[in-house]
Design a protein with these regions (language model features):
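Transmembrane beta-strands of outer-membrane beta-barrel pores
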Residues: 18-24, 64-70, 97, 106-112, ...
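Transmembrane beta-strands of outer-membrane beta-barrel proteins
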Residues: 12-16, 60-62, 102-104, 154-156, ...
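Short loop/turn motifs that connect adjacent beta-strands in outer-membrane beta-barrel proteins
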Residues: 6-9, 55-57, 99-101, 151, ...
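C-terminal beta-signal and adjacent terminal beta-strands/loops
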Residues: 112, 154, 162-164, 215-217, ...
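Gram-negative outer-membrane beta-barrel transporters
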Residues: 20-21, 108, 130-221
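C-terminal beta-barrel architecture of Gram-negative outer-membrane proteins
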Residues: 70, 186-246, 261-262, 266-271
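Signature of Gram-negative outer-membrane beta-barrel scaffolds
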Residues: 1-55, 76
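Membrane-embedded beta-barrel scaffold of Gram-negative outer-membrane proteins
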Residues: 53, 59-63, 83-169
Length: 308
């Protein structure tokens, strides 16, 4: 890894990584099925970038990274996976002033053999992933930290993205179909957050934390049966700190009230398909199914931390 000042205002960096990974596994998984893996990978992951100081407190940057990642044990248990490969291009702008900190980041990610969630789960409840050929993620991320005055702090953020399989095939009713571009599973196109903090003293602070997650699919075939609806949830967080005596340096009391408006939503679930070959002899019918994990309504956590 190296960083170098190239000329006035310009700084470059380069980061070279060489990874070697070996998998050797032999045994049994669910039931009498045998499980054997003997794979070795060598990955070269280079990264380089350029930063330009536009003005005091403002920087523009561009970077490129090539990343390669091996499958994990669960991937091997559920198939014959290949390592995924990524070319990542990013362009961004940072602002850092006493009243405003902001960052804009635009990314373009080209994947080959990306290991994506299928929506299905295995016999022990672990999510199943599979390689999907070519896929792409493009997006923009905006983050702000604004000091409104000496007591109020505002921290909004938003991420807009397009997350797609580029040439997805699916076997429906016994016939292999090219679905073309489909949405990647568990990849909402819109995610936003907001925090408004009130800090009247160094001892006490209270904040309202909000999060919005847009509609997403739990599978890769754009089936409405696999939809996770958009949701908006708000939490309240408070912290009070004091120093009682020389024996206890600090006592910190915290309160986190989750989902203060008691929103009814599901943030996760699973989706599966199977071929029905027995209901109608000589006919194959693809059946879709889904399950959801409802989230708790209003709930709270409180705690006390002592520092001696």
């Amino acid at each position: 890894k190296a960083t170098q000042t190239l000329s006035e205002g310009f700084t470059g960096f380069i980061d070279l990584q060489l990874r070697s990974i070996g998998y050797q596994v032999s045994g049994q998984i669910v039931g009498p099925a045998s499980f054997s893996v003997d794979d070795n990978f060598v990955f070269f992951n280079p990264k380089a970038g350029l930063t330009y100081e536009v003005a005091s407190g403002q920087k523009l940057y561009f970077s490129y990274a090539k990343a390669q990642r091996e499958p994990n044990r669960t991937d091997y248990e559920n198939g014959n996976p290949k390592p995924e490969k990524l070319d990542d291009f990013e362009l961004g702008w940072r602002i850092n002033t006493p009243k405003l900190q902001a960052q804009t980041n635009v990314y373009w990610m080209e994947y080959k053999d990306q290991l994506v969630l299928t929506g299905a789960i295995d016999a022990v409840g672990s999510p199943i992933r599979q390689n999907v050929g070519k896929s792409r993620r493009i997006g923009i991320e905006l983050e702000f930290k604004i000091n409104l005055n000496s007591n109020w702090l505002w921290q909004p953020n938003i991420a807009l993205s397009s997350n797609q399989n580029l040439d997805f095939y699916f076997k429906r009713d016994g016939v292999l179909e090219n679905l073309g571009k489909t949405q990647l599973a568990y990849s909402p196109n819109l995610v936003g957050g907001n925090a408004i903090m009130y800090v009247p003293s160094t001892r006490f602070q209270i904040g309202l934390l909000s999060k919005y997650v847009g509609k997403q699919y739990m599978g890769n075939i754009d089936s409405e049966n696999s939809t996770l609806s958009a949701y908006f949830v708000n939490d309240l967080n408070a912290v009070y700190t004091w120093q009682p005596n020389k024996w206890i340096q600090e006592i910190k009391w915290s309160l986190l009230m989750n989902n203060i408006f008691n929103a009814q939503y599901e943030s996760n679930g699973y989706f599966y398909t199977f071929d029905d070959t027995w209901s109608a002899p000589g006919q194959v019918t693809t059946v879709e199914g889904a399950g959801y994990f409802p989230q708790a309504g209003i709930n709270l956590l409180t705690g006390v931390m002592l520092r001696f």
